[in-house]
């Protein structure tokens, strides 16, 4: 017997027909052989076999699998129901596709970034070495170490296979290949770095111990991306030379294309660590992998056994005890993105739940209109279980259809998330849908069908059959029992929507507060472009000063340029931290400030106001008395008791006199904390401006972390960008210029995370409110249709249309009010998820809660009034005759 009969009803029918005809033919031939005429034989054979259809059905019942047959019949009926109600079907499928797609996209992000193991061999054994102060707790641990600590870990912890790395040059370094120039990201790593990760170069080799010693041969390993884009995928590049930071390096290796480049590094060079220079501060990170047979706990015990000796050069207070331990690499890498993804996942989950509740309410309404159909099925012998099974299969078919479209929607939503969030969270750009996301989509489809299908199915199975067959439509479930499930679902929708609206409202309030901050300068018309001076051709202050002076002179004569200047860093970004002390304060133990050098008229170009004293001018040169200008925060925090002008400070480069005070500008963090200073995403910490001509020799070492930025005020960004490139190229043709950015873009980037989360949660909150409004609208519309005769009688007896509409609409508003109160209470707990993203706004901000409740009530009133207006079409006389 063919296996097709288990899967195809038509195939089974054809098989049974053929078999029946064969038996009839054989019996007919037998009767003819006994002497019957062909007509007599055919008639007797048919009489002997009986009704062919009944026989076929009997054979089907004997041979078919009952479960498959029943399920197949229910599925086919579900498709017929879907075809009869195209509007409902389309609404349900599209709603499910969007919310399942959103859940799939967010799961894909969470899976790829938070859940999936790192793409290295035995990733669970990879860790960072961290350092913390015992009395401060491990939550305040740092991942940075000095040269002595690294050497002791390397030489005196035999259970660890470890490697060190220096901070990647965030501002980039100069790469010259032939006549082409580019700014690339460089990271210095110790010789064992790639072997600790377990990923060797695809071509060539990693660094040798000789290359990693101070003064060793200069070697470089290229990323696959740089090798393809800059070197054209030349397989013979290994062994050849390039100019990096103005110095010759030999290419020794190329990393694989699937190597996960955590810091988006383009080139790696030997660390060549020591206890001097950079190694004198906590500028190294250490990764480690316990050797075979050694557990993480055993390795940590060896680190602790080092005692306080690794911290000898850090000069901690005698009452502080420093400790070393291991932090799993996976945990450390996702620390900065875990909260946004968790929050986004929670928001999407709430929207999914609201969608399920909404669909359950719609199915309840449709169940009322199908009361006579369901009652007929039950009267003909279908039990409650059969009715529940049929309705659950209808819900499952809807959910699977929505899930199928949800895969496409998930891909589109993921691409949208990457487009708007990739600049803020670089990890998002490496994410793609895969089979795990497909399984999640299928699981979501199945679970959502259970959530939104069960209540309507159970409710429909409780139908009063006699009442349903004797009355019209949906009045077969008597009393309030037919209304409370839908009302409860609407209240639930509104409550969950309020939670999202409050969350979005708090994020909006935070963003508005950030936007209301006075930047301290005029950003309109400003364009910026940076240049890396971490280059062998710029090792003296004189070389840098000539670059600044000549390029600014060229810019001053460029068409469309109004003014230009150079600064070490920009507002709305991080600036350099420097220690200083007042010369006239004998007991001054030292303080910390942000600092920057200035060439040209920075204050005039950016329109930073002078508060008192004077500005830095071209007359402040290396041959004149060293001076400085400070901002208002410096004067307020550090010289509150006396006028700061005229005071002398000692900082990098010697003593200098403060000659002026300018207004504050906003920065993205400060790197230190002072009581009374804002700790939000934007702040105005103390800041010292010094003339570049008087400070470059002392501050040129900071070009490892910071690059000088040309700031130009011009008619357009395009004109300014061209002018900067031409001006710098006229001085040094081999010096690449970074991408030109409008100052407004720099400002937007500083609050990009807040803007992104506000936008995403806001969109989800709007979707939740729309679904809740649809639920209220559907409930009121169904109520009006159900009460059509009652309302007609009321109008015939003299009730006014306005009062009737108001009474109907108030029912929806009352449900929304109950939901708003419940949602407000839930929000008090839910907003803790976003507490770390709020600034200058309390998590129980009364304005936000009040506005959300009022907005929900207004929307619910509109959603209730629209269907209530249908009574305007009622003709009382016609209604009474009906």
Predicted features, each with a name:
Residues 106-109, 360, 396-468, 509-510, ...:
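Small-residue-rich transmembrane alpha-helices
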Residues 1-94, 289-291, 312, 466-480, ...:
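Negatively charged linear elements and acidic catalytic determinants
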Residues 58-90, 329-334, 363-389, 393, ...:
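Alpha-helical transmembrane segments of integral membrane proteins
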Residues 118-170, 282-287, 302, 327, ...:
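Membrane-proximal extracellular/periplasmic loop immediately following the first transmembrane helix
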Residues 49, 172, 185-210, 216-342, ...:
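Mid-to-C-terminal secondary-structure elements
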């Amino acid at each position: 017997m063919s296996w097709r009969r288990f899967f195809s009803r038509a195939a089974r029918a054809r098989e049974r027909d053929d078999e029946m005809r064969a038996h009839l033919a054989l019996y007919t031939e037998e009767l003819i052989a006994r002497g019957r005429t062909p007509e007599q034989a055919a008639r007797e054979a048919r009489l002997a076999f009986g009704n062919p259809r009944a026989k076929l059905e009997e054979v089907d019942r004997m041979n078919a699998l009952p479960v498959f047959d029943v399920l197949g019949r229910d599925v086919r009926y579900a498709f017929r129901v879907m075809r009869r109600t195209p509007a409902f079907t389309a609404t349900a499928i599209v709603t499910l596709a969007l919310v399942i797609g959103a859940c799939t996209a967010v799961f894909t992000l969470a899976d790829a970034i938070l859940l999936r193991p790192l793409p290295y061999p035995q990733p669970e054994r990879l860790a960072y070495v961290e350092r913390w102060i015992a009395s401060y707790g491990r939550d305040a641990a740092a991942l940075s170490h000095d040269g002595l600590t690294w050497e002791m870990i390397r030489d005196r912890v035999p259970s660890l296979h470890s490697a060190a790395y220096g901070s990647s040059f965030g501002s980039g370094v100069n790469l010259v290949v032939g006549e082409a120039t580019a700014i690339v990201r460089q990271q210095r790593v110790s010789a064992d770095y790639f072997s600790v990760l377990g990923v060797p170069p695809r071509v060539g080799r990693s660094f040798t111990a000789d290359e990693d010693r101070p003064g060793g041969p200069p070697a470089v390993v290229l990323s696959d991306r740089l090798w393809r884009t800059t070197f054209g995928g030349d397989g013979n590049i290994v062994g050849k030379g390039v100019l990096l930071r103005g110095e010759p390096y030999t290419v020794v290796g190329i990393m694989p294309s699937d190597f996960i480049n955590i810091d988006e590094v383009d080139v790696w060079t030997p660390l060549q660590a020591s206890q001097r220079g950079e190694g004198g501060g906590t500028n190294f990170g250490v990764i480690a992998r316990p050797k075979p047979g050694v557990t993480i706990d055993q390795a940590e015990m060896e680190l602790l056994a080092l005692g306080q000796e690794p911290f000898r050069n850090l000069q901690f207070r005698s009452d502080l005890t420093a400790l070393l331990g291991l932090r799993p690499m996976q945990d450390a890498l996702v620390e900065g993105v875990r909260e946004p993804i968790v929050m986004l996942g929670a928001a999407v989950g709430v929207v999914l739940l609201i969608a399920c509740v909404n669909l359950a309410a719609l199915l309840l309404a449709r169940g009322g209109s199908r009361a006579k159909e369901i009652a007929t099925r039950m009267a003909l012998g279908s039990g409650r279980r059969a009715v529940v099974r049929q309705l659950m299969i209808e819900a499952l078919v809807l959910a699977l259809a929505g899930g199928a479209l949800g895969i496409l929607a998930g891909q589109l939503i993921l691409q949208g998330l990457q487009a708007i969030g990739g600049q803020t969270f670089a990890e998002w750009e490496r994410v793609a849908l895969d089979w795990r996301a497909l399984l999640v989509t299928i699981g979501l489809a199945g679970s959502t069908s259970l959530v939104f299908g069960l209540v309507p199915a159970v409710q429909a199975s409780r139908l009063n059959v006699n009442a349903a067959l004797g009355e019209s439509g949906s009045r077969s479930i008597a009393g309030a029992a037919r209304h409370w499930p839908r009302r409860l679902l609407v209240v639930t929708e509104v409550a969950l929507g309020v939670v999202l609206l409050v969350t979005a409202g708090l994020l909006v309030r935070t963003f508005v507060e950030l936007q209301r901050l006075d930047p301290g300068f005029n950003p309109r018309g400003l364009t910026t472009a940076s240049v890396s001076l971490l280059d062998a051709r710029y090792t003296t202050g004189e070389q840098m000063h000539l670059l600044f002076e000549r390029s600014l002179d060229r810019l001053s004569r460029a068409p469309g340029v109004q003014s230009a200047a150079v600064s070490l860093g920009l507002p709305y970004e991080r600036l350099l931290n420097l220690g200083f002390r007042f010369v006239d304060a004998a007991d001054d133990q030292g303080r910390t400030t942000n600092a920057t050098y200035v060439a040209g008229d920075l204050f005039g170009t950016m329109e930073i106001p002078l508060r008192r004293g004077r500005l830095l001018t071209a007359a402040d040169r290396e041959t004149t008395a060293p001076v400085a200008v400070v901002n208002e925060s410096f004067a307020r925090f550090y010289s509150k008791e006396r006028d700061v002008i005229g005071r002398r400070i000692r900082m990098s480069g010697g003593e200098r006199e403060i000659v002026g005070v300018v207004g504050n500008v906003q920065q993205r963090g400060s790197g230190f904390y002072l009581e009374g200073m804002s700790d939000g995403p934007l702040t105005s910490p103390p800041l010292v401006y010094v003339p570049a001509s008087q400070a470059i020799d002392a501050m040129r070492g900071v070009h490892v972390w910071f690059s000088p930025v040309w700031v130009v005020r011009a008619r357009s960004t395009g004109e300014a960008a061209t002018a900067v490139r031409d001006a710098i190229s006229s001085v040094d043709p081999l010096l690449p210029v970074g991408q030109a950015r409008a100052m407004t873009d720099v400002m937007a980037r500083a609050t990009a995370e807040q803007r992104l989360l506000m936008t995403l949660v806001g969109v989800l909150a709007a979707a939740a409110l729309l679904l809740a409004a649809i639920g209220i609208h559907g409930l009121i519309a169904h109520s009006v249709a159900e009460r059509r005769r009652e309302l007609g009688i009321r109008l015939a007896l003299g009730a006014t249309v306005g009062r009737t509409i108001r009474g109907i609409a108030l029912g929806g508003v009352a449900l929304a009010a109950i939901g708003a109160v419940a949602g407000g209470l839930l929000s008090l707990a839910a907003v803790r998820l976003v507490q770390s993203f709020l600034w200058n706004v309390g998590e129980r901000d009364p304005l936000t809660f009040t506005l959300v409740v009022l907005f929900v009530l207004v929307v619910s009133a509109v959603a209730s009034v629209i269907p209530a207006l249908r009574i305007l079409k009622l003709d009382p006389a016609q209604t009474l005759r009906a």
